[in-house]
């Protein structure tokens, strides 16, 4: 008798994705982040669901409903902090996952890569709207500043912003719709992630060498299931350390003050995972230029496959490209730091330099480095 997992219509899908999936035998821990992102998403949906049971999406009661969750609901505090810090873990895994794709040339799987870029943008939108929901000072002013950027779009900008706000300022209508979108988007992300996986399984995984691994494949279970479980345990351990010891480490103290449209906080800044884009946005003196630069800072990922000039797929055997990659990482860390600093000398100049470097490395220096390596190898 043939095993039920290979014949049953539903079990067959699970089997082909997680059990009998032929996987390269040499993929490293950098390949763990895909499954970790899945775990993060499930965790966020579950904690978010329980938070939504007690949250009220109304300007008058939103802030106090979050306080009520933390003080009066059984284990509400841990659910709230797991959700808030879970978002940070989500983005750490996202950045690692994208970085892995850049380093090992996984972006040559075009459909999978473009689907991933869409997933990244959707997740960023979801996180932004979630940050607005507690209705603290930074929630309100963050929402005001970021939505206001759309007014830079010529001709339709002002109408577009007022349409998104549902009025002439960020108010009741804005909060209600942001809650609705924040609730629905994670389920859309889950569906998109399935499509992402579907595209990946059409080609099979890449591996650190970038060389086709058809000659040396092993079953996903038990080898990589056990490896994913180890990764998951490390993820949950680090999340719980954050939640139980320093839950407010990555948050903004201003968000413990209820939203007040009459009082602007001295430094308006988003959560840490948006700071690199925020720094790029601020580094251009022109409003529309800044908005375009910030959007392109993410959309530039779509161009990466077309800028691949190397004869090798992975950077594993390309030391010059490796240097470029790590300079890019350092540049992104610099941008993240600058995004959290006030707009004054010397931060302005550093931010502008780091922003120019970011685009220069991806658009010019990396393709040039690849061409140099090709010539050195006489390819």
From Swiss-Prot:
Residues engaged in binding heme b b566: 97, 196
Annotated InterPro entries: Cyt_b/b6_C, Cyt_b/b6_C_sf, Cyt_b/b6_N, Cytb/b6-like_sf, Cytochrome_b, Cytochrome_b_C_euk/bac, Cytochrome_b_N_euk/bac, Di-haem_cyt_TM
Cofactor: heme b
Keywords per UniProt: Electron transport, Heme, Iron, Membrane, Metal-binding, Mitochondrion, Mitochondrion inner membrane, Respiratory chain, Transmembrane, Transmembrane helix, Transport, Ubiquinone
Subcellular compartments: Mitochondrion inner membrane
Sites where the protein binds heme b b562: 83, 182
Recorded GO CC terms: mitochondrial inner membrane; respiratory chain complex III
Membrane-spanning segments: 33-53, 77-98, 113-133, 178-198, 226-246, 288-308, 320-340, 347-367
Subunit structure: The cytochrome bc1 complex contains 11 subunits: 3 respiratory subunits (MT-CYB, CYC1 and UQCRFS1), 2 core proteins (UQCRC1 and UQCRC2) and 6 low-molecular weight proteins (UQCRH/QCR6, UQCRB/QCR7, UQCRQ/QCR8, UQCR10/QCR9, UQCR11/QCR10 and a cleavage product of UQCRFS1). This cytochrome bc1 complex then forms a dimer.
Function: Component of the ubiquinol-cytochrome c reductase complex (complex III or cytochrome b-c1 complex) that is part of the mitochondrial respiratory chain. The b-c1 complex mediates electron transfer from ubiquinol to cytochrome c. Contributes to the generation of a proton gradient across the mitochondrial membrane that is then used for ATP synthesis.
Name of the protein this chain belongs to: Cytochrome b
Organism the protein comes from: Arabitragus jayakari (Arabian tahr)
């Amino acid at each position: 008798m043939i095993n039920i997992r290979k014949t049953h219509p539903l079990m067959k899908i699970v089997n082909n994705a997680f059990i009998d999936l032929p996987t390269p035998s040499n993929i490293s821990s950098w390949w763990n982040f895909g499954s970790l992102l899945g775990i993060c998403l499930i965790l966020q949906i579950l904690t978010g669901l329980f938070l939504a049971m007690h949250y009220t999406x109304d300007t008058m009661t939103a802030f106090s409903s979050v306080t009520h969750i933390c003080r009066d609901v059984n284990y509400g505090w841990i659910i709230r902090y797991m959700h808030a810090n879970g978002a940070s873990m989500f983005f750490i895994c996202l950045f690692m996952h994208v970085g892995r794709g850049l380093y090992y040339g996984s972006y040559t799987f075009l459909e999978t890569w473009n689907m991933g870029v869409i997933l990244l943008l959707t997740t960023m939108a979801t996180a932004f709207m979630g940050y607005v929901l507690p209705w603290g000072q930074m929630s309100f002013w963050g929402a005001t500043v970021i939505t206001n950027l759309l007014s830079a779009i010529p001709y339709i900008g002002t109408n577009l912003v007022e349409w998104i706000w549902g009025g002439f300022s960020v108010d009741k209508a804005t909060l209600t719709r942001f809650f609705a979108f924040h609730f629905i988007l994670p389920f859309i992300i889950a569906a998109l992630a399935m499509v992402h996986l579907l595209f990946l399984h059409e080609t099979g995984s890449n591996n650190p060498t970038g060389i086709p691994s058809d000659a040396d494949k092993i079953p996903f279970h038990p080898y990589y299931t056990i490896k994913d479980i180890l990764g998951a345990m490390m993820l949950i351990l680090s999340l719980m350390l954050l939640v139980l010891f320093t839950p407010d480490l990555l948050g903004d103290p201003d968000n413990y003050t209820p939203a007040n449209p009459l009082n602007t906080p001295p430094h308006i800044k988003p959560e840490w995972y948006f700071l690199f884009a925020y720094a790029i946005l601020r580094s251009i003196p022109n409003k529309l230029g800044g908005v375009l630069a910030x959007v392109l800072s993410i959309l530039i990922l779509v161009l990466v496959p077309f800028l691949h000039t190397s004869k090798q797929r992975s950077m594993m055997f390309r030391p010059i490209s490796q240097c470029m990659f790590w300079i890019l990482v350092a540049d992104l860390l610099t941008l993240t730091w600058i995004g959290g600093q006030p707009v004054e000398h010397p931060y302005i100049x550093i931010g502008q330099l780091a922003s120019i470097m970011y685009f220069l490395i991806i658009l010019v220096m990396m393709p040039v480095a690849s061409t140099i390596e090709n010539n050195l190898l006489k390819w």
